[in-house]
């Protein structure tokens, strides 16, 4: 069946190709797993030949009509819709999955990815809050919830979220610990609590001394206060070494030289 469908697709007869697949999908003698396998191979062939996969959508709908409760089928269709850029339709499929099977972490993650991509902050908060209940040991939901609160300027909520998240992150996960402390530092700086901000940044660098975002932000904020400029220079230099083509980090490095009165080096890094 797939071979015939691929043949018709190759000669440009999409209608005949879809008919072959549809005939298989409505065949009562085939179980759902076999049908999903046939459809998966057909989609893979479309992708390999750089052809549009939209022709598979109607086939998915045909199969979903027969098996409306099949979670894996909805997951596959949702992923295909994401690849096609059909955000709203994909979100609908993943939302259905989370309603049918609330413990389906993959569907929640897809929903979160779509909400982040579309910058739908209320939806990010809804998803993360629910997932904190469902997956209490998953720190990623604390991380993105904190970002969402920060963007809403709910700084205390963001702080509380990150501090709670720190409690569930294993000490061995030094990268994530560092990122959380970095976010805490940014929040404290935003509310003008410099002392706590710098404490948080120091803690972040204890866990990961190459956290490039923290290195840059910490250095820049120190330079704005004209405080500990040599420390700021060292951190900024490391950030530039780690990401030499990052224009933001180069600008910070140049600015620190400028603040110290080293205008020659400042000019070199500004121009680079």
Positions of the model-derived regions?
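Alpha-solenoid helical repeat scaffolds
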Residues: 1-272
């Amino acid at each position: 069946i797939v071979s015939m469908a691929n043949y018709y697709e190759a000669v440009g007869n999409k209608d005949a190709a879809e008919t072959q697949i549809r005939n298989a999908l409505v065949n009562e003698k085939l179980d759902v797993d076999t049908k999903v396998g046939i459809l998966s191979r057909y989609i893979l062939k479309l992708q390999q030949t750089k052809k549009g996969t939209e022709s598979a959508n109607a086939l998915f709908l045909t199969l979903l009509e027969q098996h409306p409760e099949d979670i894996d089928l909805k997951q596959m269709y949702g992923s295909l819709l994401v690849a096609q850029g059909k955000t709203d339709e994909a979100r609908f499929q993943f939302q259905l999955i989370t309603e049918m099977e609330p413990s389906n972490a993959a569907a929640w993650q897809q929903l979160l990815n779509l909400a982040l991509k579309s910058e739908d902050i209320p939806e990010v908060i809804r998803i993360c809050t629910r997932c904190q209940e469902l997956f209490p040991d998953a720190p990623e939901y604390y991380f993105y919830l904190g970002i969402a609160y920060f963007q809403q300027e709910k700084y205390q909520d963001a702080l509380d979220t990150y501090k709670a998240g720190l409690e569930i992150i294993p000490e061995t996960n030094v990268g994530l610990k560092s990122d959380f402390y970095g976010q805490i530092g940014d929040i404290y700086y935003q509310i003008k609590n410099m002392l706590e901000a710098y404490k948080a940044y120091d803690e972040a660098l204890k866990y990961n001394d190459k956290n490039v975002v923290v290195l840059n932000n910490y250095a820049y904020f120190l330079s704005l206060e004209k405080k500990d400029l040599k420390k700021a220079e060292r951190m900024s230099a490391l950030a530039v070494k780690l990401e030499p083509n990052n224009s933001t980090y180069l600008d910070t490095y140049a600015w620190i030289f400028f603040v110290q009165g080293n205008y020659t080096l400042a000019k070199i890094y500004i121009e680079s």
